[in-house]
Amino acid sequence: EAVSSQNTLMFKGLAPKQISTPEFAFNVNYGYHLDAGKFAEFLRRHCVEKLGVKHLRANVTGVISAENGDIASVATDVCGDIQADLFIDCSGSRALLLGEHYGVAISSKSDVLFNDTALAAQVPYTKESDAIESSTLSTAQTAGWIWDIGLPSRRGIGHVYSSRHNSEGRATEELLAYI
């Protein structure tokens, strides 16, 4: 409160911009709450229709190496082998490209970052006229925290917790009690 007006805006449920504030201008820092599914579909449509991107839906089943050890292509379950100039590993903790192909070990930070597991839910509003929170609500729990993000059509609620200090069953109970 002593260094920023953001705290006051948040607790009063106010937006960080006024109707007269120009696009992408701001008086205080802010971020947008986005429906990840709708945003992904928007990006897919924009890239395919406007940028000429070819969108393929497939699971990567293997990596084909070039002679120098780089990735020449990836093998997929339904699209065959796909060649590209750039591959981004989106396989999560499986680390198919970075870990399995290149041998890059996961760099654990569990000694300082305890929260390693998350549960998430999409919760509809009780009624269409329910207020949408202007900020992410964060609520401390026994071994983590719950986030509550208001979106136009629903709330995104999740529980991030330490699996060393809480069981999935207990974390689920805490999340359901919050909801």
Residue ranges and their predicted role:
Residues 1-33:
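Flavin (FAD/FMN) cofactor-binding and adjacent substrate-gating region
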Residues 21-174:
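Predominantly flavin-linked oxidoreductase catalytic cores and closely associated redox partners
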